Amino acid sequence: MLRLEVEREDDGRWIAEVVDLPGVQAYGATRQEAIERAKALSLRVLADRLEHGETVPEMGGVFAVLP
């Protein structure tokens, strides 16, 4: 399962970071927008890694949003 951490920045934007995929993070005007963008980016990164024969994190599910 990929874990997402979500925080509100000082400027009001939201950032969602995928803990299990270092460097994968996305901003949004709302919390939900940041989460959806991070999920979409994560799926692209995982597909790219699989396509190139790279390892991906072991997952029992897909996403868990952490408080």
Predicted features, each with a name:
Residues 2, 20-23:
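Short amphipathic alpha-helical segments
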Residues 22-33:
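A short, exposed loop/beta-hairpin motif centered on an aromatic-Gly-Thr core
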Residues 1-3, 32, 36-67:
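Short, charged, surface-exposed hinge/linker loops at domain edges
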Residues 7-20:
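Short aromatic-glycine-(Arg/Gly/Cys) micro-motifs in beta-strand/loop hairpins
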